[in-house]
């Protein structure tokens, strides 16, 4: 028998999902909660609009679209994004595991080249299974089925949790929440809308982390220098671009930041300067055809903050 706390969590998630899916076709269709749910059949052009919330970055919204149903010799779909800019953002921030290949048997996402069954069909109350995601191992349980909605909770040995709701009416998640052991949310993914027959160009950027750091400075003057090597993607070869994401802020008075990124031939690939009171948040940019070693040089004056993430990217696109 489930504990009172588990039941309370189930009711909370169901309430949240029902509210978030109004108008999407979700809800109770009279299905017996003892009945299992089979894997949905996606078609090219099916789409889901999600809002992604994280503690470190502003919320962003992305439309995920089934771009192909012939991946992995016909055993997987390709899930892409309707905006190339958003595809790049997701590649460098790396907070959305449900992009790229998704298996047809369980809608399994791939992590480090291995399919991970975040869902396992048929879904039935009491089903238990394990998978890896976000570089962690999880044990998942189906807590409840109510109408089209399946409430699932996964726990890790370090006390973190994944709480998510699968909605049979839309064939994907209505919510997906990753929480640390201390209760802080790393990711909240909420469905806003869904549909069929998307038309236009869609994109998937195969990404790989190259560099990431955060600097908080309060000294009168500080300088930082670092290098990183641009290695190829392990299976797809050379990156076609580097994608960078940055947040920068300077206090009042004489606070300043300067940033220079040079390649192995000392050619400047990126140069930025921020003056007193300046603030720039969520900037996304690209550097074409990266290779070999890069040197990053930063100078800080006064109260300043800088966050920089750089990833390699290889863009694929489909016209639907």
Each language-model region and where it sits:
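Extended extracellular/luminal ectodomain segments enriched in beta-structured repeat modules
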Residues: 233-243, 291-293
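Bacterial Sec-type N-terminal signal peptides, specifically the leucine/valine-rich hydrophobic h-region
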Residues: 15-18
């Amino acid at each position: 028998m489930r504990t009172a706390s588990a039941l309370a969590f189930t009711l909370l998630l169901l309430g949240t999902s029902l509210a978030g899916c109004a108008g999407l076709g979700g809800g109770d269709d009279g299905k017996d909660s003892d009945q299992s749910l089979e894997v949905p059949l996606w078609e090219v052009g099916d789409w889901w609009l999600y809002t992604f919330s994280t503690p470190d970055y502003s919320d962003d919204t992305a439309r995920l679209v089934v771009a192909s149903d012939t991946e992995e010799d016909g055993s997987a779909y390709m899930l892409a994004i309707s905006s190339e800019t958003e595809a790049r953002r997701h590649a460098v921030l790396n907070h959305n595991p449900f992009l790229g290949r998704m298996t047809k048997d369980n809608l399994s996402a791939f992590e480090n080249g291995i399919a991970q069954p975040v869902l396992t069909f048929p879904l039935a109350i009491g089903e238990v299974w394990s998978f890896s995601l976000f570089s962690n191992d999880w044990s998942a349980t189906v807590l409840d089925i109510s109408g089209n909605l399946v409430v699932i909770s996964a726990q890790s040995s370090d006390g973190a949790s994944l709480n998510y709701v699968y909605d049979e009416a839309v064939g994907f998640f209505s919510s997906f929440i990753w929480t640390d052991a201390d209760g802080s949310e790393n990711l909240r993914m909420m469905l806003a809308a869904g549909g069929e027959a998307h038309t236009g160009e869609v994109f998937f950027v195969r990404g790989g982390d190259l560099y990431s750091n955060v600097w908080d400075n309060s000294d009168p003057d500080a300088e930082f220098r670092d290098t990183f090597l641009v290695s190829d993607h392990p299976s797809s070869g050379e990156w076609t671009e580097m994608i960078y994401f940055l947040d920068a802020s300077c206090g009042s008075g004489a606070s300043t930041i300067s940033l220079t990124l040079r390649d192995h031939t000392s050619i400047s690939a990126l140069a930025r300067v921020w003056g007193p009171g300046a603030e720039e948040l969520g900037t996304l940019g690209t550097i074409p055809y990266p290779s070999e070693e890069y040197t990053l040089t930063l100078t800080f004056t006064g109260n300043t903050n800088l966050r920089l993430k750089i990833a390699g990217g290889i863009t694929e696109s489909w016209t639907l």
